[in-house]
Amino acid sequence: MGRFHPHPDSHPHPDSHTHPDSHTHPDSHTHPDSHTHPGSVGDHSGYSTGAERVEVLERILGENERVARANRAAFDAAGVTVVNLMSAPGAGKTMLLAETLRRLAPHRRIGIIEGDIETSLDADRLEGFGAAIALVNTGNGFGGECHLDAPMVASALPRLPLSELDLVIIENVGNLVCPAEFAVGEDRRAMMFAVTEGEEKPLKYPVMFRSADLVLVNKTDLLPYLDFDAEAFRRNLDAVHPRVDVLAVSARTGEGIDAWCDWLANLLGAPGVAPIQR
């Protein structure tokens, strides 16, 4: 879908959000676990090919932009900062978030919007850390939607106590293309790349790398066992997005997680974080 939706080559970077049917409101620093049932997110799969398909896609993207602006207004009104976390399937987003919540949830009020095609498995893994969690399953359509769009995120907002949160992290559906196509009202985008994916990924899937404000290079604990050329990866990344921030992390060992948490904390500490213009 990238050919239907323009992506600027650059955008501003900073310097350097089910199971129980109810939830309890958090105190000033921590949240009791809140894990709510997903709602219907609709089906975008029924369009035709050719000119009709282009017209329908343009309508979808236009409506998405409208809802993304409404989401952004809701986030601004609540005073909450929002990060859209994207990656390929299996890159390690959920494990990263578990480690993030372990460190930040005692000090910051955090909500998670968990996007998956089916199941609540990842949302379940994030229980017990004090975050409010809203699950969105995208399984309608032919195999399910491969991304969260702005209306899907909007469907999760009534299930989060936005006015009581400092930070919402959206764990997008695992996919290297579609999530980057749809703004959801976020302040910043972080992309997780696993070294097991190979150093050519920025060249093969440039849209997501280009749209990211931060690239997290995960699974560094596996580097001794892989034929991964870190210098070639960085050259390829620079060819696509030379100004992007990069952090090496291992969600399994904890390497780099404090630096990632510092990146998030800096966003929260910056008054009036400016939304990215895409």
List each language-model region with its residue ranges.
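Nucleotide-state-sensitive switch-loop elements of NTP-binding domains
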Residues: 47-73, 77-80, 91, 100-186, ...
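G-domain G4 guanine-recognition motif of GTPases
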Residues: 88-89, 113, 117, 194-195, ...
